[in-house]
């Protein structure tokens, strides 16, 4: 069985876009792959964080993943900072990373632009990301297009280490998922839905209550045509709502177009709101149970132990290959 690794930053509540675009696919992937889902809290501190908020976000993210269907018995869900081999290997890989290639990373350029004081961790972030992946002999990494450059570096570092020292690491395959809906902002439907959107009406949080979801969908940008039809170029708002509706219910977009033929946007938006509320309700109920119980800590302890066992074996081989320690 091939291994998949996915890292998730604990930076606030996940959106409906995260769920329909990625988590749903992860739930399906765990049946066919050995999956590691890592809450990358050490990556989060490359920018300033409030410690209490960070702790809260870590637990909230873990609870949402489990509530969404990630099975802690068939997958490994854990917190990065609880497995010290990540930073150990991150440092070892920094020793074979070149400053020039790290400075070329688009995300580093974007995040450091206009900043007077830039954290060195922001520069070396990709070396730690490579360590996250290589520790588990990962075969496949499903990532968005924005992370492809970092993944190419992880591949290069694996090959560089293997050539220079010993053939330790599996060179991972980068997979940009073709499945999974790309959900756009409700207010600017040409932009991806994001939790960092300054306009709160632009995104639906996975923990939004039903009335709030309904209000956001009813205020979603459409057009003046009044026809429910999928046309991404000319009707981005309506097309986005159709994608959301279809992803939540499993009904095809063609069937939904027929269903709302001759009906206005009011009826259509109500249908979308109901579909989203029905999709998120069981997840929210499970989340509330988990966040209040000791079960979540037990699951994260189990995940830490499983991850540590695999990571420990890899780091031992890597240290030996580099000549670190006594034996």
Curated annotation (Swiss-Prot):
Q: What is its main location?
A: cytoplasm
Note one Pfam family from the annotation: tRNA-synt_1b
Q: For this protein, what is the EC number?
A: 6.1.1.2
Which terms under GO biological process does the entry name?
tryptophanyl-tRNA aminoacylation
Sites where the protein binds L-tryptophan: 132
InterPro entries membership: aa-tRNA-synth_I_CS, aa-tRNA-synth_Ic, Rossmann-like_a/b/a_fold, Trp-tRNA-ligase, Trp-tRNA-ligase_bac-type, Trp-tRNA_synthetase
Q: SUPFAM superfamilies from the entry?
A: Nucleotidylyl transferase
Where in or outside the cell it occurs: the entry states: Cytoplasm
Q: Which UniProt keywords apply?
A: Aminoacyl-tRNA synthetase, ATP-binding, Cytoplasm, Ligase, Nucleotide-binding, Protein biosynthesis
**Alphabetical list of HAMAP family matching this protein:** Trp_tRNA_synth_B
What does this protein's UniProt record list under function?
Answer: Catalyzes the attachment of tryptophan to tRNA(Trp).
Can you say what this protein is called? Tryptophan--tRNA ligase
Its lineage reads:
Bacteria, Bacillati, Bacillota, Bacilli, Bacillales
